[in-house]
């Protein structure tokens, strides 16, 4: 059955209806977007260029930085455009594409965090077998697998949403196209779409979350009951602190949005929580990893010296 929609475009009503705030919000979110792309881009380049960071942990960190750059680029450029535009329209195809990439990158990031937690579990609980278990082939296979699962999960949502009939209002009370606000505009039966959102997306969100918690549970019990050393426990948890903070930043708003969507939360609440995981989390991830990770800070300092040192040589030679 072909899509019989009569709607050719949607109107994204944005973050706020107060026109006086639009220029201010444009500057704020443009700054956030620049910091997010620059910070995650710097981590990605450092992980690629520094041989000391060619390990499974930083391989996955590079994947996370790449995801965060793409993730924020799915929603923020259109949001910035709409801050300065009177006609805040997005085409039907553009809306479905935005929905697809949003769920593709979001679900991939959720699974990636679970893989990163497993990597920490192997490193702490099975240190002698770490290089054997987390070999480059396995790391590459896991990365490709979660990217593919995320893609096909998003494809399912985008195909099912594109087949709905939109025959009424085209005003989306959100700053980007997502499944939940689109289902509110659809005519006809959306029970299957609601089921996909609750069950499939809920499983992809909650499954990795519980696997992450399970990894940390095994790490804590292993160190506490087998080593009986609080100092080792504190040291191990310190190395995992950055990852755990990122997990909390991502899952707190995601759980609020997708697990409680059936309770009828307002669109204003949805927009606020969406800002947390689409805007705030990607910009905080590089800050968390650079501030709490000595290896990343060291690699960043070495990279800065490599980039700045030739300039000092040229400056001294020209003065001579």
Swiss-Prot record:
Main location (coarse class): membrane
Gene Ontology CC: one annotated term: plasma membrane
Gene3D superfamilies with a match to the protein in the record: Rhodopsin 7-helix transmembrane proteins
CDD domains linked to this entry: 7tmA_OR12D-like (cd15915)
GO BP field: detection of chemical stimulus involved in sensory perception of smell
Disulfide bonds, paired cysteine numbers: 95-177
Positions glycosylated per UniProt: 3
PROSITE patterns: G_PROTEIN_RECEP_F1_1, G_PROTEIN_RECEP_F1_2
GO molecular function ontology, one term from the record: olfactory receptor activity
The family this protein is said to belong to: Belongs to the G-protein coupled receptor 1 family.
Function: Odorant receptor.
Protein name: Olfactory receptor 12D1
Species name: Homo sapiens (Human)
């Amino acid at each position: 059955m072909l899509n019989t929609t009569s709607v050719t475009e949607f109107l994204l009503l944005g973050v706020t209806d107060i026109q006086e705030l639009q220029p201010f919000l444009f500057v704020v979110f443009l700054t956030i977007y620049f910091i997010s792309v620059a910070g995650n881009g710097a981590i990605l380049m450092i992980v690629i260029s520094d041989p000391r960071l060619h390990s499974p942990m930083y391989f996955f960190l590079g994947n996370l930085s790449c995801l965060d750059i793409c993730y924020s680029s799915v929603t923020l450029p259109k949001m910035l455009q709409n801050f300065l535009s009177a006609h805040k329209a997005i085409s039907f195809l553009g809306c479905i594409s935005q929905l697809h990439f949003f769920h593709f990158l979001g679900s991939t990031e959720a699974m990636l965090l679970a893989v990163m937690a497993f990597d920490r579990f192997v490193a702490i609980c099975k240190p002698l077998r770490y290089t054997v278990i987390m070999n480059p082939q396995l790391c590459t296979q896991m990365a490709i697998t979660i990217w593919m699962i995320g893609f096909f999960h998003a494809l399912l949502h985008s195909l099912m949403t594109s087949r709905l009939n939109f025959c009424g209002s085209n005003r989306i009370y959100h700053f980007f196209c997502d499944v939940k606000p689109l289902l509110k505009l659809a005519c006809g039966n959306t029970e299957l779409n609601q089921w996909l959102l609750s069950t499939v997306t809920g499983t992809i969100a909650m499954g990795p979350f519980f696997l992450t918690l399970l990894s940390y549970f095994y790490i804590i019990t292993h160190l506490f009951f087998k080593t009986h050393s609080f100092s080792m426990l504190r040291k191990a948890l310190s190395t995992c602190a950055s990852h755990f903070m990122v997990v909390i930043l991502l899952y707190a708003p995601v759980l609020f949005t997708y697990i409680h969507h059936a309770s009828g939360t307002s669109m204003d609440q949805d927009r606020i929580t969406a800002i947390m995981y689409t805007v705030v989390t990607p910009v905080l991830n590089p800050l968390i990893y650079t501030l709490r990770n000595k290896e990343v800070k060291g690699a960043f300092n070495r990279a800065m010296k490599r980039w700045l040192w030739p300039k000092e040589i040229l400056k001294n030679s020209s003065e001579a």
